[in-house]
């Protein structure tokens, strides 16, 4: 017996989330704990975004397990939501039909492009002569 499953990943800065999407009964777990335990509440709503965008009917027969490592809390949440969104699209492409995949992609892209495409911005390294990458120490002429 082979189970229908796909594996996708989401990234934000140094945080990486790997999502395993398979046929099931609608469970969503992040690092082994339910999605309802994500703290603080504002970040929990960010994780819920891909789910609320497409409606809960698309999740009835799907289980999602997400493992996330690296980065801070906010980066991890953005990586999780990207992994979930990409996992849904991949699952619908592989096991449902092309039309529903295109519909999901269109919904996600119109709401927020980073749900499907990784944010390529990275931190610029600090240089000498100042406090940060671009900021310089104040200059005095006398």
UniProtKB/Swiss-Prot annotation:
Predominant location category: cytoplasm
One of the GO BP terms on file: maturation of SSU-rRNA from tricistronic rRNA transcript (SSU-rRNA, 5.8S rRNA, LSU-rRNA)
Classification via InterPro entries: Ribosomal_Su5_D2-typ_SF, Ribosomal_uS9, Ribosomal_uS9_CS, Ribsml_uS5_D2-typ_fold_subgr
A Pfam family the protein falls into: Ribosomal_S9
Any one GO molecular-function label of the UniProt entry: structural constituent of ribosome
PROSITE patterns: RIBOSOMAL_S9
Cellular component aspect of the GO annotation: cytosolic small ribosomal subunit
Keywords in alphabetical order: Cytoplasm, Ribonucleoprotein, Ribosomal protein
Alphabetical list of Gene3D superfamilies matching this protein: 3.30.230.10
Localization terms from the record: Cytoplasm
Purpose of the protein: Component of the ribosome, a large ribonucleoprotein complex responsible for the synthesis of proteins in the cell. The small ribosomal subunit (SSU) binds messenger RNAs (mRNAs) and translates the encoded message by selecting cognate aminoacyl-transfer RNA (tRNA) molecules. The large subunit (LSU) contains the ribosomal catalytic site termed the peptidyl transferase center (PTC), which catalyzes the formation of peptide bonds, thereby polymerizing the amino acids delivered by tRNAs into a polypeptide chain.
Annotated family: Belongs to the universal ribosomal protein uS9 family.
Quaternary structure and partners: Component of the small ribosomal subunit. Mature ribosomes consist of a small (40S) and a large (60S) subunit. The 40S subunit contains about 32 different proteins and 1 molecule of RNA (18S). The 60S subunit contains 45 different proteins and 3 molecules of RNA (25S, 5.8S and 5S).
Name of the molecule in the record: Small ribosomal subunit protein uS9
Organism: Candida albicans (strain SC5314 / ATCC MYA-2876) (Yeast)
């Amino acid at each position: 017996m082979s189970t229908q499953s796909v594996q996708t990943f989401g990234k934000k800065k140094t945080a990486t989330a790997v999502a395993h999407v398979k046929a099931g009964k609608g469970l969503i777990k992040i690092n082994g704990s339910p999605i309802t335990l994500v703290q603080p509440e504002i970040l929990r709503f960010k994780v819920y975004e891909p789910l609320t965008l497409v409606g809960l009917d698309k999740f009835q027969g799907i289980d999602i397990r997400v493992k996330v490592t690296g980065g801070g809390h906010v980066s991890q949440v953005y990586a999780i939501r990207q992994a979930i969104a990409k996992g849904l699209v991949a699952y619908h492409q592989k096991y449902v039909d092309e039309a529903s995949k295109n519909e999901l992609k269109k919904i996600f892209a119109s709401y927020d492009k980073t749900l499907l495409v990784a944010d390529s911005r990275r931190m610029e390294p600090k240089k000498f002569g100042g406090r940060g990458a671009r900021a310089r120490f104040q200059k005095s002429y006398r």
